[in-house]
Amino acid sequence: MTQQTQQYGVVPAEQIKGMDIMNPEGEDLGKIDEFFIDLEYGRLSYAAVSLGGGFPGMKGKLHAVPWQAFSWTPQGKRLVLNVDKQALKDSPGFDKDDYPDLGDRRWLGSVFNYFRQTPYWGIGEEGSEDAARL
């Protein structure tokens, strides 16, 4: 990676898949298995996370995490998620072979709410608080 990549956090998509995730305490939480782009809004919507070791019975299950819930550590080339292992295990998930309806805003809204993130859709649309500031 170049110095600019480290400074600005711009990486090829192929480097995101498989990237390690830890919490601020340094506990291994898992890896990015897949990520989903919202073509309507032009946003990286959420990542599907496979859990790290220590979670019996979780093989084949993925957990949806809003992309904006992650921070990036260029030194360690890892993503940081401010949750503990149990909270991630209890988060909205789905089977690796049975994805949810990817366009279901109600389901995705529950994912964003679980991680205390504001859903990006609707931001800046007519009548919204953000639209008035533009």
Language model features with spans:
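Peripheral interaction segments used for macromolecular assembly
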Residues: 1-134
